Swiss-Prot record:
F(1)F(0) ATP synthase produces ATP from ADP in the presence of a proton or sodium gradient. F-type ATPases consist of two structural domains, F(1) containing the extramembraneous catalytic core and F(0) containing the membrane proton channel, linked together by a central stalk and a peripheral stalk. During catalysis, ATP synthesis in the catalytic domain of F(1) is coupled via a rotary mechanism of the central stalk subunits to proton translocation. GO terms for molecular function: proton-transporting ATP synthase activity, rotational mechanism. F-type ATPases have 2 components, F(1) - the catalytic core - and F(0) - the membrane proton channel. F(1) has five subunits: alpha(3), beta(3), gamma(1), delta(1), epsilon(1). CF(0) has four main subunits: a(1), b(1), b'(1) and c(10-14). The alpha and beta chains form an alternating ring which encloses part of the gamma chain. F(1) is attached to F(0) by a central stalk formed by the gamma and epsilon chains, while a peripheral stalk is formed by the delta, b and b' chains. Belongs to the ATPase delta chain family. This is ATP synthase subunit delta, chloroplastic. It is a peripheral membrane protein. The keyword Transport applies. Signal peptide: none annotated. InterPro entries: ATP_synth_OSCP/delta_N_sf, ATPase_OSCP/dsu. Its main location: plastid. GO terms for cellular component: chloroplast thylakoid membrane; proton-transporting ATP synthase complex. Gene3D superfamilies: N-terminal domain of the delta subunit of the F1F0-ATP synthase.
Amino acid sequence: MKQKIVEPYAQALFRLKDDIDLTPLWEMARDSKFMQLLMNPSIPKEKKWQLFQPFDKLVQSWLEVIWKKKRMNLLAEICASYLELRKKKEGIVTVFVTSATPLTDTQTQQLEVQLTRMCQAKHLQCEYQVDAQLLAGLKIQMNGQLIDTSWQTQLKQLMKSLW
């Protein structure tokens, strides 16, 4: 339901201009203190609006529409949706890699070459994390798919088959 509300705002800005870096606005909107200030009815709108002065006129006009439609509480999600549209246009695929131990530079380079081929991306944006509970192997999440080669999962499957 939330996506149905969020996406039209992101798509509207994207259709007008598809190369705006909304990362600073997204980071501001993810800050709970910033959002409390923005949603505080005792602070005049003019004071709140000064926070958006660094952004260009198009972004300010877009924010005005979001404000009038009372959707500022969804600003972080709207910005994230816009940034995803930009990534898609630019051929950037975000990949989340979880390993049992930190990967070496050589391992990450080899993995990124293979993943780039697999997903046919122009650019790969990899985010790595370590989870010792995996025991060994990797979990790779990209394009809505999960590739799980961890020993933890293999052991669970073995236990299921035995019982």
